[in-house]
């Protein structure tokens, strides 16, 4: 049986939200049938790199994604020239996904997925450029995915998209009385009220 290799395009595989979601899928897919490889935009190794390679994934490195950089675009196109084996590209670069998707389209990659993980972008100096790049995503992608309605509506406007719920290994969150007692002992909490926060503050 031929193994299908899917190219996941990310900034780097640190322990962020979308990276953790990807790893949750990656750990449980049938890797005899489907393999994930990763195109990252950092030269240094990241938190999940060892695990990816242990599961048979390849990691390719490009310079930082700068949409107006001739050096970046040259490196991106060279990558696709050298790797015609990829027939599915799954891009997680928010508004700048269009840069990769357009190159993939020009290299006749038949399945080009844009995946929205946010309902907004930082309003910094690059914000107008990101909004301009966002407009062409539906034209360059063959499939539009979002983690939720807000993320899909913001990224894709009126274009039709599919919501892909983030994968979570629920067994990691199963209540365990022994762990509760031990952790409270380690933290010196005894029976005090503890208020927890799950998520980020940004």
Model-derived segments and spans:
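Membrane-interface segments of envelope glycosyltransferases acting on lipid-linked substrates or membrane lipids
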Residues: 1-202
